[in-house]
Amino acid sequence: MKIGFDNEKYLKMQSEHIRERIGQFDNKLYLEFGGKLFDDYHASRVLPGFQPDSKLCMLRELSDQAEIVIVISAEDIEKNKIRGDLGITYDSDVLRLMQIYQGLGLYVGSVVITKYNAQESAELFKNRLEKLGIKVYRHYLIPGYPTNVPFIVSDDGYGKNDYIKTSRPLVVVTAPGPGSGKMAVCLSQLYHEHKHGIKAGYAKFETFPIWNIPLKHPVNLAYEAATADLNDINMIDPFHLEAYGETTINYNRDVEIFPVLNAMFQRIYGESPYKSPTDMGVNMAGNCICDDDACQEASRQEIIRRYYASRRRLLLGACSEEETYKLEMLMNQANITVHDRPVVDAALTEAERTNGPAATLELPDGSIVTGKTSDLLGACSALLLNALKELAGIEHEIKIISPQAIEPIQSLKTKYLGSRNPRLHTDEVLIALSVSAATSKDARLAMDQLPKLKGCQVHVSVMPGSVDIKQFKRLSIQATFEAKYEKNSVFFNNKGV
């Protein structure tokens, strides 16, 4: 992987910039954290060199000044809203996040339940947190929010919310997911702090879109691809252009809400500290790109992967056609097609040659390895073994797992576990390989290559099973699939998608 982002520079510059912003106010800053505080794999893919936990590392540098406030909506508690990436409810994720932050030496001050209306489930969650010794505050639904500014910024609006007692200069406001009410919590606190004679500040920390690179830069287009389901649109910040004559990039929701925020700031402070949505941000990522070409190419590949992921969801009925059409449009804007992903043509060519499912993997040196379906192995399983043999320098003809090791697993699947498919999935073939490694030097050597698969690109000519998809993720392989089922699949239709 070619590095395009200076992570060390980012950690230093970002923490310094946040300290500067704290100093612009009465040593009190409410920082709304958008996106993921850790495990930010999108950023690490489009900015090669960005570490998935960079934002968390940056916060740890400020740990003596920072406290975290976690926000959750009572409506999300009531609906048992699930985090799609983790499969857990938002209220469970609050406890998970607290444990992670505290384990890293970060201080979690409290939890805020927004849109509170004495919902039974919200009250139960509040009681549960308080029994654990966690401070809980309630923020209520405000009639006319967010447009009725005179009412919102009054004792009958923000004034009815609980005042969150904080003890440190930097208050990081985060949440399990979008729509939790982070911004409203920050603004409510500005109102209450002002009542207490403190001129606290507000800032927003989101990595994307990057404000100081071009609108149609592939990194920013990749952000639109990542949020295609939300229909976020990057745009030139008109307020910043008018105030400073400078072109900067923001996204539509921040631009649309800025006049309302500006009016709120004016009502709280008497004047607004910001002239544009860009002014509110503190993101320094754009200043830390050290190889623009590397970041552009990484982002183009991300857009293609997002396109394939959308086509898969469309086949499963999990997204709209509009989402897929938007991704096609973004590919056009980036001047790319699926053929710019090297593993795609290689997989389709192999599938045509063998008249069956095929999979291809691009190794770190750029060479392509293929896998095809056989009586013993599925295409993805064969691909993994072939890639490991190639990395280990083992001749292709050498069998690193003997058929005698595979056949008992096949028998178990078909005779006792009710499976109709005797071929080994990727998880099963890796277990067989690990067993063989106890007695085979070649199998052991192949096993040792597994970490080298991290970040490799894969394409499969059909939709693989969920087990294989999950295994690719566990190995940190970036995989795409054609949105069609294998011909003998019960789900097969001749049209595909």
Predicted regions and their residues:
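Flexible phosphate-sensing "switch/lid" loops adjacent to ATP/NTP-binding sites
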Residues: M1-T174, Q189-E350, G356, L363-D365, ...
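Short HxH-centered metal-ligating active-site micro-motif
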Residues: E390-P422
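Hydrophobic positions on the alpha1 helix immediately C-terminal to the Walker A/P-loop
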Residues: V185
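The conserved Walker
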Residues: G177-P178
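A short, polar/charged loop-to-alpha-helix boundary motif
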Residues: L376-A392
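Short clusters of small/polar residues that mark proteolytic maturation junctions
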Residues: K372-T373
